[in-house]
């Protein structure tokens, strides 16, 4: 509701930290949001400093499977997860013949994988820069329902991430900035030292 009234703020909820995050621009906007929430909902807000947003990926291919078979349900999904180019996000494709699994089931599996925000096995940060290929799947003529593939595909992704962690190929991605710095000659040495100390690089 407030986000609709003040479109420049962005409100989001983190499943990992169980916190509501708001992108604000300065103290004045912070005070305005506090005031609105207090007047409308009688809630006193407390804003804490933001934390670093990490993401996770993998450094080597991993084959994984997810199985879901409670009473009168059945689905099995096999995936190949591969590292993708930085900044590419998550790509989901099928390498499976329609002779093995009908196309509508394949689309369902890919949609189920895409709809979930998958978290890595290191810090529980959002997964990114991964290519996920559907390489095999099984259904039961009588017992398979749509939600069964959702459970099996989510389990397959999770299992793949756990295998990557166990193999030492899970990767934590830290945010970084590219910027141009203009300084007097006498300050260049100090700036270069500071950048190196913070694991930065320069040209």
Each predicted region: which residue ranges?
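Accessory interaction regions appended to the cores of large information-processing enzymes
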Residues: 1-203
């Amino acid at each position: 509701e407030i986000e609709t009234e003040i479109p420049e703020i962005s409100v989001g909820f983190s499943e990992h930290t169980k916190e509501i995050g708001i992108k604000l621009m300065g103290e004045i906007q912070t005070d305005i949001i506090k005031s609105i929430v207090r007047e409308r909902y009688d809630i006193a807000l407390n804003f804490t400093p933001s934390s670093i947003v990490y993401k996770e990926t993998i450094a080597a291919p991993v084959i994984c499977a997810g199985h879901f078979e409670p009473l009168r349900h059945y689905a099995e999904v096999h995936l190949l997860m591969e590292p993708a180019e930085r900044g590419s996000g998550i790509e989901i494709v099928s390498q499976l013949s329609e002779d093995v699994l009908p196309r509508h089931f394949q689309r369902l599996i890919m949609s189920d994988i895409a709809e979930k925000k998958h978290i890595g096995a290191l810090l529980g940060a959002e997964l990114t820069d991964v290519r996920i290929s559907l390489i095999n799947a099984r259904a039961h003529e009588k017992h398979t329902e749509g939600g069964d593939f959702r459970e099996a595909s989510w389990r397959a992704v999770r299992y793949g991430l756990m295998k990557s962690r166990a193999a030492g190929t899970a990767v934590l991605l830290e945010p970084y900035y590219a910027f141009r710095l203009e300084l007097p000659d006498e300050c260049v040495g100090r700036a270069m030292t500071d950048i190196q100390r913070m694991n930065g690089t320069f040209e």
